[in-house]
Amino acid sequence: MPELPEVETSRRGIEPYLVGQTILYAVVRNARLRWPVSDEILTLSDQPVLSVQRRAKYLLLELPKGWIIIHLGMSGSLRVLSEETAAEKHDHVDLVVSNGKILRYTDPRRFGAWLWAKDLETSNVLAHLGPEPLSDEFTAQYLFDKSRNKRTLIKPWLMDNKVVVGVGNIYASESLFAAGILPDRAAGSLTDAESVLLVATIKAVLLHSIEQGGTTLRDFLQSDGKPGYFAQELQVYGRAGEPCRQCGHPIEIAKHGQRSTFFCRHCQFRPIWPIMLW
């Protein structure tokens, strides 16, 4: 599933082609996504795009009448194409804008969403979200206080959007590895010092992934059709049985909250970051 770096990469990729342009029309080839494509998407002709923002894993297109809210789901991606590009099987939604470009949404598994909101404050999908991990609001003190008395395992706890947004399976595993914290510890066991280190590693891992265009494991593509290159630098995620890049011991895999967790039991008792290959 695209996580914060992939969504932010998409935002940065599409923003120059949309902001200041006017929507000519939309094409919905298949409205049956995770939630049905909002009817309003087809009524936005002559609406200028004022901004392209991101909240958590949602892309937000600001128009005078309201907001288009896009979620990439498990396998979605957005590309900016020229007008003559023919649609393929999994190309479900197009926005055609006044510079002749098409914002095309492709989603083989159809688990994403195209929703409409008159204002973000009343949007159910954006309610109750935690802080952005790259914001000043996400601090070591916040994480330490939030973790007190929590018996939940730390890895699924970090993936809870009420705690912090956008840190999914890939980046939770990678950040815990960089911080030298085993994923099967209770969240409440975090110390002050570990909270400082974990916040720093989460920010560093996310920022570096954004610089690399995110992680492509299967379906995700950047807006220009290129894959994300952070997959080549993953330290533990998806590497079960392979030698750890730091110590040579095999990477282990476990199930935490129905999700696969990757870690190095030999390394994750001491900080690895900033002594990372990248």
Swiss-Prot record:
Binding site for DNA: 90, 109, 150
Biological-process GO terms, alphabetical: base-excision repair
Zinc finger (FPG-type): 235-269
Keyword Membrane attributed: no
GO molecular function, a single term: class I DNA-(apurinic or apyrimidinic site) endonuclease activity
EC nos: 3.2.2.23, 4.2.99.18
Catalytic activity: Hydrolysis of DNA containing ring-opened 7-methylguanine residues, releasing 2,6-diamino-4-hydroxy-5-(N-methyl)formamidopyrimidine; 2'-deoxyribonucleotide-(2'-deoxyribose 5'-phosphate)-2'-deoxyribonucleotide-DNA = a 3'-end 2'-deoxyribonucleotide-(2,3-dehydro-2,3-deoxyribose 5'-phosphate)-DNA + a 5'-end 5'-phospho-2'-deoxyribonucleoside-DNA + H(+)
Family annotation (InterPro entries): DNA_glyclase/AP_lyase_DNA-bd (IPR015886), DNA_glyclase_Znf_dom_DNA_BS (IPR015887), Formamido-pyr_DNA_Glyclase (IPR020629), FPG_cat (IPR012319), MutM-like_N-ter (IPR035937), Ribosomal_uS13-like_H2TH (IPR010979), Znf_DNA_glyclase/AP_lyase (IPR000214), Znf_FPG/IleRS (IPR010663)
Keyword Zinc-finger: yes
Cofactor note text: Binds 1 zinc ion per subunit.
Cofactor section: Zn(2+)
Catalytic-site annotation from UniProt: 2-3, 57, 259
Keywords, sorted A to Z: DNA damage, DNA repair, DNA-binding, Glycosidase, Hydrolase, Lyase, Metal-binding, Multifunctional enzyme, Zinc, Zinc-finger
NCBIfam families in UniProt: fpg (TIGR00577), PRK01103.1 (NF002211)
Family in the record: Belongs to the FPG family.
Subunit structure: Monomer.
Function comment: Involved in base excision repair of DNA damaged by oxidation or by mutagenic agents. Acts as a DNA glycosylase that recognizes and removes damaged bases. Has a preference for oxidized purines, such as 7,8-dihydro-8-oxoguanine (8-oxoG). Has AP (apurinic/apyrimidinic) lyase activity and introduces nicks in the DNA strand. Cleaves the DNA backbone by beta-delta elimination to generate a single-strand break at the site of the removed base with both 3'- and 5'-phosphates.
Protein name as it appears in the record: Formamidopyrimidine-DNA glycosylase
Species name: Yersinia pestis (strain Pestoides F)
